[in-house]
């Protein structure tokens, strides 16, 4: 590898909007996220089902189908 062409690799704290934080390595100095594995519905098991049937019924009612 050539010297002097690679960016500096730092230890960084990643801070989530939910208050969770964890350490990783990156070329950035700080990382802020809105959602992480501690608060994402897929990882927490608190997924919401989308009511697509209601939307279809509203469409059919609106356009007389």
Swiss-Prot record:
GO molecular function: metal ion binding; rRNA binding; structural constituent of ribosome
Keywords: Metal-binding, Ribonucleoprotein, Ribosomal protein, RNA-binding, rRNA-binding, Zinc
UniProt entry tagged with the keyword Cytoplasm: no
Cofactor(s) demanded: Zn(2+)
Cofactor binding, note field: Binds 1 zinc ion per subunit.
Transmembrane segments: none
Sections of the chain in a coiled coil: none
Protein name in the entry: Large ribosomal subunit protein bL31
Organism: Geobacter sulfurreducens (strain ATCC 51573 / DSM 12127 / PCA)
Gene name as annotated: rpmE
């Amino acid at each position: 590898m050539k010297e002097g062409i690679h960016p500096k690799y730092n230890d960084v704290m990643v801070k989530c909007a939910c208050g969770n934080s964890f350490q990783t390595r990156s070329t950035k100095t700080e990382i802020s996220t809105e959602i992480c594995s501690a608060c994402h519905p897929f990882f927490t098991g608190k997924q919401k089902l989308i009511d697509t049937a209601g939307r279809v019924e509203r469409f059919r009612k609106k356009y007389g189908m």
